[in-house]
Amino acid sequence: MKKAVSVILTLSLFLLTACSLEPPQWAKPSNSGNKKEFTIGLSVSTLNNPFFVSLKKGIEKEAKKRGMKVIIVDAQNDSSKQTSDVEDLIQQGVDALLINPTDSSAISTAVESANAVGVPVVTIDRSAEQGKVETLVASDNVKGGEMAAAFIADKLGKGAKVAELEGVPGASATRERGSGFHNIADQKLQVVTKQSADFDRTKGLTVMENLLQGHPDIQAVFAHNDEMALGALEAINSSGKDILVIGFDGNKDALASIKDRKLSATVAQQPELIGKLATEAADDILHGKKVQKTISAPLKLETQK
């Protein structure tokens, strides 16, 4: 009997020892083969602009291709709403943020909130003045402004009288496009007036109506985006004047207007490509890869044929 008990005890000890040698559950290799599905939060300045609708489309297509989920919020050109939207995305636990700032200064608080919890930030089309941003994905806005001024000078000659319709005050795109434009215009053109129309078509129309009354001798208009350019063109057509108008973006309405020989030209961006590049950058960052501080998408001058 004692011998039987001894055998049983020996077997029990053997089994306990074998069990203790098995690695813990977290250390076992996974056989599921599943990869983490990353969620990115996208904050757009406004989806009332065809440019940003195309940009969103590029992000959604690339995210789907990479197995990523996208949560989209529309700031409706309200910087306070955008800050709140981004804070909400952080609370929802997104893995990365893609932000198209309404105002480059105002968005800084939200960027810093993301930094505090380790959520990487990629800005699109416009930069953030403060906070850590992994990369800015945008066209070369300064170069685009220079292209617009050179086009006007080439068409109308030195000293042509030009009006400038500026974008949202505080937006980096407004500042950079204006800076590039004046790099050339201050030497070759006469900028007789400039005023903000907030990247908005209706405001572009209203502002242009007022500018035409105060400056009836305007020969050309450079608008910081196509929406303002198309609004300005409507005001010009109503006045019966023949004025060269160039926009910036290359959206569908602008390209159609150029084809119809109404809008003179646009500095065309590639919003879908910008969205694609931004999503690629976010995915690379989430997988521990390094990205460039600035990722540029090429520009093209679209003119009447």
Curated annotation (Swiss-Prot):
The protein's matches in Pfam families, at most eight in alphabetical order, are given as: Peripla_BP_4
Lipid positions (N-palmitoyl cysteine): C19
For this protein, the record's InterPro entries field holds: Peripla_BP_I, SBP_2_dom
UniProt entry tagged with the keyword Signal = yes
Q: Write out the GO biological process terms.
A: transmembrane transport
The answer on whether this UniProt entry bears the keyword Glycosyltransferase reads no
Summary of the function given for this chain in its UniProt record:
Part of the ABC transporter complex RbsABC involved in ribose import. Binds ribose.
Q: What is the protein name for this chain?
A: Ribose import binding protein RbsB
Q: Which gene encodes it?
A: rbsB
